[in-house]
């Protein structure tokens, strides 16, 4: 029998052990170190935990200490002596690194800047070191040893196994139950074919509240009874359900109703052949009568083609509607002056002209709306590109062209008034528009003048359906203007203005001015008496706000605190009195 190897757990960590430890921590976490150590043959649970917390944890900081961190380390070592775990957590560094850095700082101060001790990184792999968990891992030497291969294979098998023994047993039991159920169904089917009807055995219930999904309806809630009697309908439904079950048990679920029998097929085929032979003997053609039915003869209406209006008729009707719409004219144009018979060229020319005018109006309206927008509130300058500058120039040119075109249109559209002898009598009644009321425009968001304010006032009155009332002073002023205009005589000579009201004499004016001056001086003297009162009032307010109110609040707070202490003392004295009374009563009873 070969000797059993004895492992002394500990020593330098290898690269394979570090990788196994990382994978085990990912699966088992940082609280089940006994399970983690079971994957490592030469390491204990304590050593695995120290290795993770001192070297492998990705949260640890292994960079060089800065001056601020050195100062913080010295302060913490002075405040928390020999509590290196706590200091390491606060510094986010391993405890051994903090100890070595602290010793190095002390030795450098004692020796004048030369460090004498060796740190963790100064030791070589393989040297005897009690703090092997803080050392670097030993690199792999080519091929792995047999022990390392065995340890790695076992760790891989255990870490890759996501199902434990209990889960595997549950899966095996579930598969066994499924196979039993399938065998039971097969046996019942064979017995039923042999004429023996065997009912399905109900499974045993572990609890009294278990649900049989083959018999019961899961979580069924019976509907509440209504106001009408439905017992007759229930009996009919139950009877139909029983008939359906008997039919299914006898013929199956689908039945044979959808399958045409062979006898019916043969009878139908023979009947068709006999009918065809009889018609052929009589000389009748079965092509039109048997294959399809002739459609009913429907003649189209006159002026249409196959029951539909022709394309030319549609086009002509639309053209007449357009001509009638264009010949209506404006609202104030008399009917006698409207053109009744015009040629196709005049209509096309007027259509083109009206389309251009409509486009120009829309474009001008858009330009005006963009111009009425408020100026931007940004502070930076907006530099226009060359394309935008060209567009602005085109808009300016377009506005000029539009003004010229409008002037020319006004000259062309001017209609000379007919003579009194030849002109017919024109009705001055305006043709009403298509709608009874005009649409109400929107408010101007940023009114910049009195006209804009007046416009917004008119819009508000229109929305509220209130008449726009002229102020009384304006009405009086207009009446006065009209009365004066009646007395003005127009002539070629210069106009003479006569003042109806005479100016008062100079003495009266001086007396009124003197009286006003005296009243002003009297008011100033009264104000001199008010100024000391104002100053006194300000002083009293400052004293009240800065001294009296804070003192009152402080006294109130102190009173509440003293009163609370007083109440606590009273409660304690009352409890002490009750205890003494109870003691006296007990002693007297004894």
From Swiss-Prot:
Residues 244-286, 336-355 are annotated as: Disordered. CDD domains: SANT, SANT_CDC5_II. Residues 460-490 are annotated as: Interaction with PRP19 and self-interaction. GO terms for cellular component: cytoplasm; Prp19 complex; spliceosomal complex; U2-type catalytic step 1 spliceosome. The keyword Cell wall biogenesis/degradation does not apply. Residues 1-60, 63-110 form the HTH myb-type domain. Changing residue 84 to G: No effect. Slower growth and thermosensitivity. Complete loss of function. Complete loss of function. Changing residue 52 to G: No effect. Slower growth and thermosensitivity. Complete loss of function. Complete loss of function. PROSITE patterns: HTH_MYB. Its main location: cytoplasm. It is found in: Cytoplasm; Nucleus. Residues 33-56, 84-106 bind DNA. The keyword Acetylation does not apply. GO terms for molecular function: DNA binding. Keywords: Cytoplasm, DNA-binding, mRNA processing, mRNA splicing, Nucleus, Repeat, Spliceosome. InterPro entries: CDC5L/Cef1, Cdc5p/Cef1_C, Homeodomain-like_sf, Myb_dom, SANT/Myb, SANT_CDC5L_II. GO terms for biological process: generation of catalytic spliceosome for second transesterification step; mRNA splicing, via spliceosome. Residues 244-263, 271-281, 337-351 have a biased composition (Basic and acidic residues). Present with 784 molecules/cell in log phase SD medium. Involved in pre-mRNA splicing and cell cycle control. Required for the binding of the NTC complex (or PRP19-associated complex) components to the spliceosome to mediate conformational rearrangement or to stabilize the structure of the spliceosome after U4 snRNA dissociation, which leads to spliceosome maturation. Its absence leads to an arrest of the cell cycle, possibly due to the inefficient splicing of TUB1. Belongs to the NTC complex (or PRP19-associated complex), composed of at least CEF1, CLF1, ISY1, NTC20, SNT309, SYF1, SYF2, and PRP19. Belongs to the CEF1 family. This is Pre-mRNA-splicing factor CEF1. It comes from Saccharomyces cerevisiae (strain ATCC 204508 / S288c) (Baker's yeast).
